[in-house]
């Protein structure tokens, strides 16, 4: 049933903080930067890529909500 499905990654506070900090300066990463971050945080490239994809979607959703609230 769960063949091939990865378990959900839980990030440490430090990892989340570092990822958020990076996102604040840049919403998109180059491959080189993604590799650097992955090495620094002991995560793999795919985890970084997916975290940024998810974070961009959250940012987009939050932006839409802010606009709606200001009307």
Curated annotation (Swiss-Prot):
It is found in: Nucleus. Its main location: nucleus. The keyword Transcription applies. One of its GO terms (cellular component) is nucleus. InterPro entries: Antp_homeobox (IPR050296), HD (IPR001356), HD_metazoa (IPR020479), Homeobox_CS (IPR017970), Homeodomain-like_sf (IPR009057). Keywords: Developmental protein, DNA-binding, Homeobox, Nucleus, Transcription, Transcription regulation. GO terms for molecular function: DNA-binding transcription factor activity, RNA polymerase II-specific; RNA polymerase II cis-regulatory region sequence-specific DNA binding. Pfam families: Homeodomain. SUPFAM superfamilies: Homeodomain-like. Gene3D superfamilies: Homeodomain-like (1.10.10.60). One of its GO terms (biological process) is anterior/posterior pattern specification. Residues 4-63 bind DNA. Belongs to the Antp homeobox family. Sequence-specific transcription factor which is part of a developmental regulatory system that provides cells with specific positional identities on the anterior-posterior axis. This is Homeobox protein Hox-C5.
């Amino acid at each position: 049933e769960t063949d091939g499905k990865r378990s959900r990654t839980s990030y440490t506070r430090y990892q989340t903080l570092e990822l958020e900090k990076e996102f604040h300066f840049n919403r998109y990463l180059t491959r080189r930067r993604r590799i650097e971050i992955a090495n620094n945080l002991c995560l793999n490239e795919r985890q970084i890529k997916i975290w940024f994809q998810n974070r961009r979607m959250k940012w987009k959703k939050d932006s839409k909500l802010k606009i709606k609230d200001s009307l």
